[in-house]
Amino acid sequence: MEFLRRRIETQVLSLTGLALGGIDYENPPGDPGLFGPASVCWRVHGDFTSMLVGGISALLLQALHPLALAGVWDHSNFRADLLGRLRRTGQFISATTFGSRADAERLIERVRAIHLQVTGHAPDGRPYAASDPDLLTWVHVAEVSSFLKSHLRYLGPTLPDHAQDRYYAEVALIAERLGARDVPRSRAQVDDYLERIRPQLRCDERSREILRILRAAPAPSALAKPFGMLMLHAGVELLPDWASELFGLPLTAQRRQLIRTGVRCTAPLLRWAVRNGSVHRAHRRMGLPPR
């Protein structure tokens, strides 16, 4: 049984930012980082399964914004190294949530510097810049709204409304530090923002290519392949209805229930197996009992 547990954990951690190294989540002792263990974002960001589903859904949602997608398309090797991009994104989220304050601030400054180099023109001729405050807000909202929605669906459905609002207020700090402006800080503000930005979104050939790349992404092992496909289906199923319609991905109620049941049956096994994720290491840094 211990062999199985370690095997599963190794497979899981190979998909995360921990595989990149460079962040010591267990030091310095007692450093709460930017948020600390009493924060809501420690609860929401601490579960691998719900974060993976939310991350896939966020990636698809972000791909509906032509300018945001153009920056990734022109300045990233995601088509050849999707796993690498997911790891780097995961590292940033984990380090800014669970890392020491010094590591979190270092990564924020690194990403800000990278964003300054990402400029160009979308296929329709419009200029874009990754440092554009409005684009940064879009990427942030697409991401954190997907994380929270996945958490509510697959881990913490009873998270109180006030805690959900607090989550948005907490993570707004990261977006603002990156240069975003007018960042929504509550459920009502997020809902209003998504409604206002919808006229700017569309599904084009590049958007559909993102979906094709996700579907064709190689699994790190034969053991992980069925799990990866389930997570992809769950990420698609998590999309807002209007986003699913843009992608042309209607799902029947029966199909939705099948996907959700699959995730809920799989998640407990992963939670049992993983004992050394970033959240576990951060708990050790803070001298807290194991999760």
Please state what every model-predicted region is.
Residues M1-W138, A142-R291:
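Mature, function-bearing regions of proteins
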